[in-house]
Amino acid sequence: MDIYQHRRHNKNLLMVHLIFVTKYRKKIVLGDFRDAVKQYLFNTCVKNHWYVKRMETDQDPVHILLQYNPTDSITHIVSILKQHSTYLSWQQHSALLEQHYWKKHVLWSDNYFAASIGTVSQAVIERYIENQG
């Protein structure tokens, strides 16, 4: 099985480990909301041709290991993931979010962590992400 993405003029394997935290580090990514947030993030990745290798949450942080295209910047990926998941979360779970975020339609902190990874360390990062939550 070839793990590389084949394009007309390139062959690549670009992967990044992303971590988002909720605004004010609120511990709200639980239960049904946790599953919904993961689904929103996954669907956004599929729509943009990013491939989720692993994703897990632990009340507040969300860890995602994804493979992306060389035409996409990490900043762009993070922005799209946060925007779409926030919008959908407020549409579907406004009662929950209004308890924590008064008058502001926010979900994520402005900050994020991103680390590019090589294939040598992928298994280690996957185990780490699987053990979250």
Residue ranges: model-predicted function:
Residues 1-133:
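Basic nucleic-acid-binding interfaces
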